[in-house]
Curated annotation (Swiss-Prot):
It comes from the Eukaryota. GO terms for molecular function: ABC-type glutathione S-conjugate transporter activity; ABC-type xenobiotic transporter activity; ATP binding; ATP hydrolysis activity; ATPase-coupled transmembrane transporter activity; bilirubin transmembrane transporter activity; organic anion transmembrane transporter activity; protein domain specific binding. Residues 318-601, 975-1260 form the ABC transmembrane type-1 domain. This is ATP-binding cassette sub-family C member 2. It is an enzyme of class 7 (translocase). Residues 633-857, 1296-1530 form the ABC transporter domain.
Amino acid sequence: MDKFCNSTFWDLSLLESPEADLPLCFEQTVLVWIPLGFLWLLAPWQLYSVYRSRTKRSSITKFYLAKQVFVVFLLILAAIDLSLALTEDTGQATVPPVRYTNPILYLCTWLLVLAVQHSRQWCVRKNSWFLSLFWILSVLCGVFQFQTLIRALLKDSKSNMAYSYLFFVSYGFQIVLLILTAFSGPSDSTQTPSVTASFLSSITFSWYDRTVLKGYKHPLTLEDVWDIDEGFKTRSVTSKFEAAMTKDLQKARQAFQRRLQKSQRKPEATLHGLNKKQSQSQDVLVLEEAKKKSEKTTKDYPKSWLIKSLFKTFHVVILKSFILKLIHDLLVFLNPQLLKLLIGFVKSSNSYVWFGYICAILMFAVTLIQSFCLQSYFQHCFVLGMCVRTTVMSSIYKKALTLSNLARKQYTIGETVNLMSVDSQKLMDATNYMQLVWSSVIQITLSIFFLWRELGPSILAGVGVMVLLIPVNGVLATKIRNIQVQNMKNKDKRLKIMNEILSGIKILKYFAWEPSFQEQVQGIRKKELKNLLRFGQLQSLLIFILQITPILVSVVTFSVYVLVDSANVLNAEKAFTSITLFNILRFPLSMLPMVTSSILQASVSVDRLERYLGGDDLDTSAIRRVSNFDKAVKFSEASFTWDPDLEATIQDVNLDIKPGQLVAVVGTVGSGKSSLVSAMLGEMENVHGHITIQGSTAYVPQQSWIQNGTIKDNILFGSEYNEKKYQQVLKACALLPDLEILPGGDMAEIGEKGINLSGGQKQRVSLARAAYQDADIYILDDPLSAVDAHVGKHIFNKVVGPNGLLAGKTRIFVTHGIHFLPQVDEIVVLGKGTILEKGSYRDLLDKKGVFARNWKTFMKHSGPEGEATVNNDSEAEDDDDGLIPTMEEIPEDAASLAMRRENSLRRTLSRSSRSSSRRGKSLKNSLKIKNVNVLKEKEKEVEGQKLIKKEFVETGKVKFSIYLKYLQAVGWWSILFIILFYGLNNVAFIGSNLWLSAWTSDSDNLNGTNNSSSHRDMRIGVFGALGLAQGICLLISTLWSIYACRNASKALHGQLLTNILRAPMRFFDTTPTGRIVNRFSGDISTVDDLLPQTLRSWMMCFFGIAGTLVMICMATPVFAIIIIPLSILYISVQVFYVATSRQLRRLDSVTKSPIYSHFSETVTGLPIIRAFEHQQRFLAWNEKQIDINQKCVFSWITSNRWLAIRLELVGNLVVFCSALLLVIYRKTLTGDVVGFVLSNALNITQTLNWLVRMTSEAETNIVAVERISEYINVENEAPWVTDKRPPADWPRHGEIQFNNYQVRYRPELDLVLKGITCNIKSGEKVGVVGRTGAGKSSLTNCLFRILESAGGQIIIDGIDVASIGLHDLRERLTIIPQDPILFSGSLRMNLDPFNKYSDEEVWRALELAHLRSFVSGLQLGLLSEVTEGGDNLSIGQRQLLCLGRAVLRKSKILVLDEATAAVDLETDSLIQTTIRKEFSQCTVITIAHRLHTIMDSDKIMVLDNGKIVEYGSPEELLSNRGSFYLMAKEAGIENVNHTEL
């Protein structure tokens, strides 16, 4: 090599001088070829990847041209350099080969750089990471040659001037290109800048500066947040996961089947003695209960596949993060060696000063590279965690769309939402830190290795301590996992009950049952908090053990080292190098509790997710969809069941339905009509046979499913808007009159579950949704059950019937309305799941079979209201068109009113009655005028019309009052106690460092000899005592903080629950359930787990930094001056960051709520979504919502990295400044001081970073307290109990007086009751009628004070209801509501949640409610389990249970709020009979839905526009020939004087 350069290649003597330098030959060869070799090694891979991508070429930019121009300049300079070498090589002057070689290498390299830069422009507008590294390497390696040439020019100005100047210019261009690569070219305004960011911008996260600046200037909104990269979007990551999951789950299922086959070889026990052939209707409750117990004992399901699938999906990111963490971990161990060199440098008077500066610079460089690697690693890990959460959430949603009904019944909506919210988050948290497991092993192993080098075999004593503690940690970890499993179950139970409470809150308020359900929730919460305390205690013990481990190891190791051999002296180099290594050891050991806890929690979640995602899908193989077939629907020996353990519900059905036919399906209650529909939709388990369907299907369920959105959106249901078709559907479904009344018309927002629509309106919207779809087959499951007879007739004629909108389509029409049957093509009569008869209407009557007998019975008992037909209008007029008792309608809607009035006018005119004609014309004109006024009022914007308000998002800093609220919940004395012991922990830490420094100085003072064994023992004893004091103080402070924070969680949850239950009904009408549930799930979970952990970490970091800075300033007082600018930089970064991070966390919380609400809505409407085959549309909407949330999460993750890299730079500067000052002042310092300062300074980088992280985490997590406080501060309804309490037997008589009573729903809205004045005497039966918006339901709500008075009084038995407590009022009244809502729990709990009544009284109530035989037939009787929403009972049985509640309470005042609107004739008759018998001496107020049910009332109240327009006996009102007369006339009963039915 010497000949190659014509100079010395390497000479160590050059370094042994105050002005050290490297040989020029070394600089011109090795330091030139290193960067060039790096480029040539990686460039081919780059060019090949571009060639493979074949991406569309990007446009040429000025930025790209500038880089290419500078490279061309370098190319020219290389050519000039080669030319100079050739020119100089003349005569006797010999130019060394290196002068030819380097220019040629540079020429080739610059051409390669041009090609690579061009390829990057072709691929994407992003600087190549390895080009950036090449320029950095080139500039760094060039520094040495640069300074050598400068020195040479200063010594001899004429030596190699041309070459030197060419090098300087070339070096300058390389610096310019390095600077250019630090910037990115222009990017798309909507695309995240991370895609096009340069390498330097990527590793420093400078591309995020704009967002941070924007967040500091004003609170961020969703529009300010960048969209995430396509590769991170839900569809992209989920598609990769599904490809892996399909294979892994298949293998897991095969293994599961093998396990199942083995277990089935054993004798099978029957399920609680149940016979498979027991009646399904009688024993469904027993089966539910037995299956739940069975599920608890079995844990068999496809296992151990989810982690494999996730690894296959994200293995590239995992590998990248692995490499980055490995580099970081290896670099960590360079700092102790550099520290050792610096201590030796200070102690040695012969060391050259440049050596100290080199050590300081290297220490800074190493820590800087560590920071870049660590933060890039964390970015990869956290983004990986985000993608894992995205994948899991999307997969859960997709699974919900395909899950079989049997599998779905194992999960309540609350439990499934928990999988999406809690379990996916646990998996994300574990993914963030999972690589710390192997990293900890490497760090611990390398720490022990280097400690062995310092202290020899003595370290084995320390290792022994660690090994002894491993089993203890294992036992604690197992116990923690078991507690976590139990706590997740408790959370599921609590959220399940909360979902039910929120769904049935109106019932709870009517019956004053809030305390009972509050007690249930608090009971589960008590168990949860007990487990949380145990979890915290074990975690504290684990933290104590892992924190004290390095202290014990250091004490034991140092003690053994000095005790085994008197020659072993603990000097500064050994002690502080070892302490630095112990500090490195401390990090993995301190992180292991969190990582272990996170992984254990995640393992529980993985089990739960594997069970759900591995569940059976809906088996649609029995439903064969064909395109060319002569039948629309064909049942071939089809048998279906809801549960394989039960006999078939639909048995051996053979049925052919031709295209275009209208087929009616009839039968008694429980005959299998709805099951037949479900079988066609593929919702049941196939036993044998199959169903063939030709074409698409549309479905209208018996219980309407309405989405939270506008009426228009619900009708269109994702289809394209067609004005003509849309108007036809609205008219046919009788929705136009309703749209005229509703604010906003068809753009009126429907609340959750259609809360602001009547039952009839919801059903007609549901029918309109189906009618708008251009389907081939329409499956209508009793769609007219919730509308009155005249609207039903209109809908049948205009939509379903032979001349309706759907004429020509295949219609399968399940109905109780026998009067429609003459119009259908074929009638199918079902009984016990089989077809009893089928044929045309006339054929079945002629057969004189089951159908003919039922028809005869119907005609005998139907009365005047049963004679209506639907053949044509004229026949209807002649026959006195009336209400049919079998119709289950709700006539309080505008369509009903409009049609009644129109029909009334038509009939009156046809009979030529002048007086009636005049009234009819006047009525018609008044109706027209009213409609005009309504349309005018629609144009006015009325504040408060919007029902569901957008979720409020706080902006700016979290108010100090929120912190105070949480600290107050924690307890001020507890806070002082915790701070005291954290402070004492840090004092003990400082003391142990100072003591160790004094100990190491003994070796210098005693010239390597030990003073005495007692002195040595004293040093060991005090050092050990200080270490033990650290551990004890930490344990006490941690335990106390866990106890105090648990009390805070208990208080906040208690306040939230109490206030939510006391919130007025209007709060629940305007707030989606998902939004409230989010407070009880995500926010409470944060307060339980994350916030206490964050506060503990913050205090440890704060005291740690304070102690470290104090120690550094004690050693080098000059450092106090440097602290000032570093503190300013530190605080500035924190201020910028916290403003952004805080708002991003809020946006994250707010954007989660729609995901959970939409999911709950989807699960509820699954049969409809599947029937319409809209799974993909719903899946796309879910993916869109998740992506909106994910962009907030990604931005928050990046903000943490942006902060961390800048804070670590501050920490690195602290290390560098400390090392620099120690080099400068080395003559006044000793080795122990240097070791003392630097060992603590090296520790400060992570601690500074962690402090701001914890500061931000504290503020972002305190947002959970802010959100909880928002609902804690929601305005309450009136007190439940006041000092003024009514007599125990009140109301004794049941007399009710309304005195000029007025009410409005919200302060900004108009009055809905306008001066109601009437007197209802004791024992009177009053029927209330009126149109939608007349005020009937409002009257009921006022009686129970669901709505509070805006003026006037309601007096019951002489007591103003406003003067007593709500529960004193509501407990003395009884209501049977329209919607029969039940809660999960026992039948007895649903009847008597407070256990006020004896079993005999409960059984008597069941007997009077006609349910005794049913309940006594159940194995568990009153203790039989009711599932969520009462889904395992029929609607009729649910309504009879509600009747049982009323009978059990038997108040003097009973309100029937359309109690029989949604039940069949049989149930209606049972309810009416019991009420007339049991409540004969009570005051009964009935809101009418069928006129025949109130014709025997003592008085009739007719409401219109919030006023009483008529009030009197039925005879009196009929003789007045007013509005009630017209309604009765329409029903064909105006001549009935006092009908007893």
